[in-house]
Amino acid sequence: MNKKYFKKYSSILIFSMSILAPMTLASCSYNLAKEKDKDQKESTNLSEPNKSNTSKTNTFQDKKDSTNKIDSQESSKTQSQNTSESNQNTKVDSSKTNNLATNQNNPSKSNVNIQETNETKQEQNINPNNAVISEKQAENDKNASSLNSKQINNTLKNQDKTKQENDQFKQESKDSSNFTSPKPITHDPINKVISSQSTTRLEMPKNDQSNSESEDNKKSPESPKWWEKLNQGDAF
């Protein structure tokens, strides 16, 4: 019985070992490959920061070099400008000395020479900003002059128009005054109003005349009649 169990269990063990052995070998090889990959990655990660640091240092150095070059160029420009200004100042000083020497001999020309030196200084000190400002000022002056000319033309036109209207009004008033105006109204002695334009004398109608004559004869036979008084007033 023991031999049977031993053979049986031994066969099982051999079978299990035959299965487990390659699995263990495969897992071991897989783990070894993982470790190798990790080592390679770590080595690459360590090498890459060094590369980035070197590139950063190189770019920083290049920037420094470029800034230093720019600074050196600007300093050289400023030095050249300073030398040119000093040369101009020396020229101005020499012109001043020459002008002083000539002014001592010719005092009448001293003011002219001083003005010329001042004008040269002003021309030398003018910068582009001043040139732009002067151009803007010139444009503003042109615009102002054009506006003033327009206003002057408008005022002249208005004056001419008003003058023409006044002349026309005066002419119309003269023409109206030349027409015959009505004569003033006069009063007769009996307070009867008649117009001076009418030259015809008043005449009573025939029927009314007879009645008025009879009434006047009754009142005062010797007194003149009222229409005769009217005619006498017109005569005066």
Curated annotation (Swiss-Prot):
Residues 43-60, 75-112, 143-157, 193-212 have a biased composition (Polar residues). Residues 61-74, 158-175, 215-228 have a biased composition (Basic and acidic residues). Keywords: Cell membrane, Lipoprotein, Membrane, Palmitate, Signal. PROSITE patterns: PROKAR_LIPOPROTEIN. Residues 1-27 form the signal peptide. A lipid is attached at residue 28 (S-diacylglycerol cysteine). GO terms for cellular component: plasma membrane. Belongs to the M.pulmonis LipAB lipoprotein family. This is Lipoprotein B. It comes from Mycoplasmopsis pulmonis (strain UAB CTIP).
